[in-house]
A protein has these predicted regions:
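A short glycine-rich, Lys/Arg-flanked "PGG" loop and its adjoining helix->strand segment in the class I
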Residues: 155-162
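A short SAM/SAH-binding and catalytic strip from SAM-dependent methyltransferases
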Residues: 142-152
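Hydrophobic pocket-lining residues within nucleotide cofactor-binding pockets
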Residues: 132, 148, 168
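Short glycine-/acidic-enriched loop or helix-start segments at secondary-structure transitions
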Residues: 86, 154-155
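Single conserved hydrophobic/aromatic residue that forms the stacking wall/gate
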Residues: 163-173
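Class I SAM-dependent transferase core
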Residues: 4, 8-69, 120
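Conserved SAM/SAH cofactor-binding pocket of Class I
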Residues: 61-139, 145
Length: 173
């Protein structure tokens, strides 16, 4: 692996990212760019490797400091192309943490992509093809999302999902 690329990943604070993790992140980038030719995984404006590293990978990896490492699961709401969920799963693998990352996405095509990536990189994920707004509750240690919905909607959604509302209709979006 190119030292420039390895040094680039050193921006991920406090993780001492291994070459193996860097290789997996680079594989993820290649898969994103390839699949993006067919379906909209990321914006066309950020379709170059350096832009994907900075705008998506490094940005998504910042959440790792807030993930409850003692929990069995972490949930990514409206994961889209897998950010931040796939990045967290790659980092968890490096940390030898057995936490499962639940990836909620309603798009069939994106779910197929997420499953392919998870299988190829041997990530501990579960891809759940459902509209998160139609789910009554979830059990998870950490909830994360990126570029999903405005913050007030996310906070209301999380409040309803974690505190077992009798019905999604009881919550207001």
């Amino acid at each position: 692996m190119d030292n420039v690329i390895f040094n680039y990943y050193s921006k991920i604070t406090g993780l001492n990212v291994s070459r193996e993790t860097c290789n997996e992140l680079e594989s993820l980038i290649s898969m994103i760019l390839e699949k993006n030719k067919q379906i909209n995984i990321i914006s066309k404006k950020t379709c170059e490797k350096d832009a994907v590293r900075e705008r998506h990978i490094i940005d998504s990896a910042q959440i790792i400091d807030f993930v409850d490492l003692n929990s069995n699961t972490t949930t990514d709401l409206g994961t889209g192309g897998g950010m931040p969920g796939l990045i967290v799963a790659i980092i968890m693998k490096k940390l030898k943490n057995s936490m499962k990352i639940n990836l909620y996405e309603k798009s069939y095509h994106k779910c197929v992509f997420l499953k392919e990536v998870s299988k190829k990189l041997k990530l501990n994920t579960e891809v759940i093809q459902k509209d998160i707004f139609k789910i009554n509750n979830i059990e998870t240690g950490t909830v994360m999302s990126r570029a999903f919905k405005p913050m007030p909607i996310i906070l209301n959604l999380v409040s309803c999902l974690l505190y077992t509302s009798p019905s999604p209709r009881d919550c207001q979006w």
